[in-house]
């Protein structure tokens, strides 16, 4: 189980760093032009904090796998992370329109890869909590 936590830790830290390219990749300079200053800043600041918390989740999994798998507190943290990633998996299917990826090879691949990743996270966190 600790190996899974290490894999998750590294993966989440990489995912967090990928957020750095979001403004350029999604062309936020143009796409967000029509938004108010408040909404523009909410997009960028919330993206930063999402990336930060994902990075810190990864760091926790990477550095504290033993505690997460071997203590009552670690199991409780796993429950919280399991709930978080279960909601994220739900949003993957019911929050985003399939129009964003259906019929687009790259976007479909990303949808499938991340759906699988969210399932993997759920499997590990819930299995650890219930063990």
Stretches with model-predicted labels:
Residues 38-45, 101, 119-122:
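Hydrophobic alpha-helical segments at protein termini of multi-pass membrane proteins
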């Amino acid at each position: 189980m600790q190996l899974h936590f290490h894999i998750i830790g590294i993966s989440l830290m990489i995912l967090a760093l990928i957020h750095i390219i979001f403004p350029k990749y999604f062309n936020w300079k143009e796409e967000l032009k029509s938004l108010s200053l408040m909404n523009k800043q909410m997009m960028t600041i919330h993206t930063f904090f999402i990336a930060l918390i994902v990075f810190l989740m990864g760091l926790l999994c990477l550095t504290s796998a033993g505690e997460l798998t071997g203590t009552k507190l670690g199991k409780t943290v796993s429950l919280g992370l399991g709930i978080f990633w279960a909601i994220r998996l739900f949003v993957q299917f019911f929050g985003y329109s399939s129009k964003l990826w259906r019929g687009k090879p790259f976007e479909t691949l990303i949808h499938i890869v991340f759906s699988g990743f969210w399932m993997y996270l759920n499997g590990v966190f819930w299995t650890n909590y219930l063990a």
